[in-house]
């Protein structure tokens, strides 16, 4: 079972995403409202993926860069109610792997995560030759 951490200042959003992931077969090992606490959960549980609200990604703590440097296999999904092209490009450049749009639709969230994982596996296989 793949492990996940959720970081979002909105408790309702955290709860909904927790339900979607849990019912989708993921083990949510922690959730919090702040990026620094999210990083502590990452250090403790070593999840396969972390879902972070846009606000936590942009809070000035360089959290994406820290995760990519120290946990390069952890997939980062940005969660936001509105993702414009500039935000999307900036997030991809920083190392975000995928995007989850609010309001959540369970099937769309799970499909996004699955397709990102499959694309990463395919890319790794192609690089391995």
Question: What are the language-model segments listed below?
Answer:
Residues 51-65:
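Conserved phosphotransfer microenvironments
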Residues 11-30:
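Two-component/phosphorelay signaling modules centered on CheY-like receiver
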Residues 43-45, 67-73, 94:
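Conserved phosphotransfer cores of two-component systems
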